[in-house]
From Swiss-Prot:
Organism listed in the record: Vesicomyosocius okutanii subsp. Calyptogena okutanii (strain HA)
TM regions (residue ranges): none
Name of this chain's protein: Succinyl-diaminopimelate desuccinylase
Family: Belongs to the peptidase M20A family. DapE subfamily.
Residues annotated as catalytic: D68, E133 (proton acceptor)
Names of required cofactors: Zn(2+); Co(2+)
UniProt lineage: Bacteria, Pseudomonadati, Pseudomonadota, Gammaproteobacteria, Candidatus Pseudothioglobaceae
Cofactor binding description: Binds 2 Zn(2+) or Co(2+) ions per subunit.
Length: 376
């Protein structure tokens, strides 16, 4: 059994449901200690994190990832126990195989091979690992990145091992992500009997024209890297549950996935301007969960594209689609180039999550060639 598969099975067999680590990081740290990495344990609250680095020179190339996984869901729907790390028909099954313990195993085996082949490599190799990516993401990567900034640790390039492939390994590299802005507002009306609307003020009727305005607004037209900013309503709540009462308030929850053409401040201002045009009282709150980031073509992107071409002989595509990742913390806090490159995302967060064993071996090979392209 290969080093990559051995490590993957060890990690997947641990039920590290977010924000628990349960020893996954100890396995990684033990492996990195053998390669003369300097390890810094960084526990914030109940979250385990670590920073590891080998070398003291630039460029600093960092692997970033997480050891926590999402809950398994209905275990009876799994073909095999979700933490048994079983192999069947060339696939490794288990929660976290694709997201993202398979990537962690590939990183470690690639690093081991690279250090043994190039013991005097230039620059430095780092690892930024957390157990708080799938949960609130409060005491994880964001805190580690802030710590690294505080100690003036530079990071020139960062590869996050999130599952990025759509149809085959290496077909997609995420070279950026949209920002995410959550909002919620309450429309204040006046409760009353539904047969006497003149004695009440229906907040649902009041808010519908404003919602139409928000849904029809063109926030921007995107650019060559990002699609147009998206506004989506995720929740509308109102009423008392009976048919004869006009509600006294209505609550709306929404989200922006926004491009680099907008800022959170601009979006907030424009939403309030649209609401202010309407004759109702409202209260609004905001939660910003991630800035957009973009890594343009250059040393890091080229190193990844060329590594994929070497191993898979395919031409990869750059994409900024999808949800947020911890890259949203690393890129702005450490002012660094970030890309995401990992296995298939076809079964992530699903029952019977699995990853191709051949893909894990090829991913390790790709990571090896990325290290070689940047640090030799």
């Amino acid at each position: 059994m290969s080093k990559t598969l051995t490590l993957a099975k060890k990690l997947v067999s641990i039920d590290s449901i977010t924000p628990q680590d349960k020893g996954c990081q100890s396995i990684m740290i033990s492996h990195l200690n053998d390669l003369n990495f300097e390890i810094t344990d960084l526990k914030f609250g109940e979250v385990d994190n670590f920073w590891a680095i080998r070398g003291q020179q630039s460029p600093v190339f960092v692997f970033a990832g997480h050891t926590d996984v999402v809950p398994v869901g209905n275990e009876s729907e799994w073909h095999m126990p979700p933490f048994s790390a079983q192999v069947k028909n060339g696939m490794l099954y288990g929660r976290g195989t694709s997201d993202m313990k398979g990537s962690l195993a590939a990183m470690l085996s690639a690093t081991d091979r690279f250090v043994k082949d190039h013991s005097n490599h230039k620059g430095s190799i780092g690892y930024l690992i957390t157990s708080d990516e799938e949960g609130p993401a409060i005491n994880g990567t964001v805190k580690v990145a802030q710590y690294l900034k505080k100690i003036n640790q530079t990071v020139d390039y960062c590869l996050v091992g999130e599952p990025s492939a759509t149809h085959e390994l290496g077909d997609i590299i995420k070279n950026g992500r949209r920002g995410s802005l959550n909002g919620s507002f309450k429309i204040i009306g006046k409760q009353g009997h539904i047969a006497y609307p003149h004695l009440a003020s229906n907040p649902i009727h009041l808010v519908i024209p404003a919602l139409n305005d928000l849904c029809n607004e063109v926030w921007d037209e995107g650019n060559e890297y990002f699609p147009a900013t998206s506004f989506q309503i995720s929740n509308i709540q109102s009423g008392t549950g009976v048919t004869n009462v006009i509600p006294g308030e209505s609550n709306i929850v929404f989200n922006f996935r926004y491009s680099t053409q907008c800022t959170q401040e601009q979006l907030q201002s424009r939403v309030c301007a649209i609401l202010d045009k309407r004759n109702f009282e409202y209260q609004i709150t905001w939660e910003h969960s991630g800035y957009p980031f973009l890594t343009p073509k250059g040393k890091l992107v080229n190193a990844c594209v060329n590594a994929i071409k070497t191993v898979k002989n395919i031409n990869t595509q750059l994409s900024t689609s999808g949800g947020t990742s911890d890259g949203r913390f690393i890129a702005p806090i450490l002012k660094t180039r970030v890309i995401e490159l990992g296995p298939s995302n076809a079964t992530i967060h699903q029952v019977n999550e699995c990853v191709s064993i051949q893909d894990l071996e090829d991913l390790s090979d790709i990571y090896y060639h990325i290290l070689k392209n940047i640090l030799t």
